[in-house]
Amino acid sequence: MESPIEVVRRFCAAWSNDTPADELAAFFTEDAVYHNIPLEPVSGRENIVRTIASFIRPGPPGIEGIEFRVINIAADGPVVMTERVDAFKLPDRSFELPVMGTFEVTDGKISAWRDYFDMNQFTSRMG
C-alpha cells in the first residue's frame, strides 16, 4: 500500500493534470471531510465532488484549472502537511495563492483535507 505522502503527492499531481472532479473522488473515503478553513466544511465524498465541480468550470467567472505546486511535504503517520502555491487559471488571467494543507490518510484514501489560506487575498485576485 502507498504511504500517506505518496497518496497526497498523487492527489496534488491529479489536480495539476486537470483531473475531473468525479475522478478525484477516488482519492477520498466515503465519509471524508474537506474544509477550506475560511469556509464551512463539506462532509462526504459526493458532497466533496460537487463542491470541487462547482468551482472548477470553464468560462467567466469560473476557474479553469488549478495547479498544486508542492513546496514542502511532511508526514507524521497518517497526517500529511503540504506547503503549496496553488496556481489558478482563469479565462482571462492567472494568479498564485500560498496554501498550507493538512491531509489525513486512512487505508490509502484521504479521510480529511484542510486548506489554510488568506481569503482576502483569494477574493481580491479573483476580481
Model-derived features: where do they sit?
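A solvent-exposed, acidic/Ser-Thr-rich amphipathic alpha-helical stretch
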Residues: 21-78
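Hydrophobic/aromatic beta-strand elements that line small-molecule binding cavities or substrate pockets
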Residues: 52, 68-73, 85-86, 98-104
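Short beta-strand segments that buttress and anchor functional surface loops
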Residues: 82-90
